[in-house]
């Protein structure tokens, strides 16, 4: 899960460096004048994208069960004394794998990497022993990408 944290102390951490904050370990992916893009070093939980079906918007991250979970993480961090301003807004472009923009852009303080973000930072991302979600929706309900076993990077099957 990706997060943006605003902190002057992260200026000393190089991109790809691991640091501890909020009781968890993170990897610094990038920084600019607004703050740092960081990724949790470990998977925090395993969960489905959605319980049940959503025929209207099957790929919409905003309607997934992941976003309430991430919102609860943010609430827990702030309840434990971390100022909300520590988490600067992250704009997630939900352009799908075919370039369609039907889901638009939305802003969160804790979110997921997109497929493009993964492509940009993959060398810095620690290896984990389980699959994890990206924010990018697949382009059509008639073709569903998946990764499987240890020999697929991306498999697209048609109906």
Residue ranges and their predicted role:
Residues 2-159:
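Collagenous Gly-X-Y triple-helix signature in extracellular proteins
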């Amino acid at each position: 899960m990706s997060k943006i944290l605003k902190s002057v102390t992260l200026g000393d951490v190089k991109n790809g460096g691991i640091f501890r904050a909020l009781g968890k370990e993170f990897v610094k992916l990038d920084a600019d004048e607004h703050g740092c893009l960081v990724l949790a070093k470990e998977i925090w939980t395993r969960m489905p994208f959605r319980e049940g079906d959503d025929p209207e918007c099957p790929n919409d991250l905003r309607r997934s069960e992941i976003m309430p979970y991430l919102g609860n993480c943010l609430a827990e961090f702030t309840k434990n004394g971390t100022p909300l301003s520590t988490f600067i807004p992250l704009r997630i472009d939900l352009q799908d794998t075919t370039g369609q923009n039907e889901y638009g852009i939305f802003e969160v303080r804790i979110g997921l990497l997109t497929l493009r973000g993964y492509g940009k930072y993959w060398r810095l991302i620690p290896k984990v022993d389980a699959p994890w979600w990206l924010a990018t929706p697949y382009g059509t309900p008639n073709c569903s990408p998946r990764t499987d076993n240890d020999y697929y990077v991306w498999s697209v099957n048609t109906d």
